[in-house]
Amino acid sequence: KIMQTFKEYHEDGEHERVKERIAILPGGFKPPTRGHFLAMQDLLNDAERGIVYIGKGERDGIDATKSKAIWDIYKNYLSKPTEVHLSPISPVKDTYDYALDNKEVDIIVGAGGPRKLKGDTFTDGDMKRYESFIKNKDKYPHVTLKEIESKEDIKGEVVRAAIKANIDDALINYFPDMSETDKDAIKSILTA
């Protein structure tokens, strides 16, 4: 907003906020898709900067190092500065550790909610992993848990299969818009 009335200024509460706000998006990201990119962008709308924690492990030839290399390209397209870290144990642990060690900042943690899997089965998503932030509000008063809506129902196994079938189509259908140079870089990462 460029201009607002005095009443609006006091009602929105922004004038009272003095703590820095950090958005955290933890996950596996094998690979990071357009949906992940859009989720981080959405979280950054309410923060000054972001942190992505990437889980270890490998799925169909895509490991954490490849995932980080792709996020390092994505962060150039995000609206706010974003750090990308490989989690030595798990993104969940790193998120809780960061919250415990950084009580002087406000933290927004993004986690996927319930969604449909194959057939008629559903998953609870990742929200359950971060319930302690809600249950222990006295311990984590500076943390807000934000459910990430599945704007695009893109599943990792579908993306990995599409990459194997036709990587050029996969880049168009499952990855964010970016320069041809960056698309080529991601293609090289995924086919290495």
PLM region spans:
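Nucleotidyltransferase catalytic core that binds NTPs
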Residues: 4-192
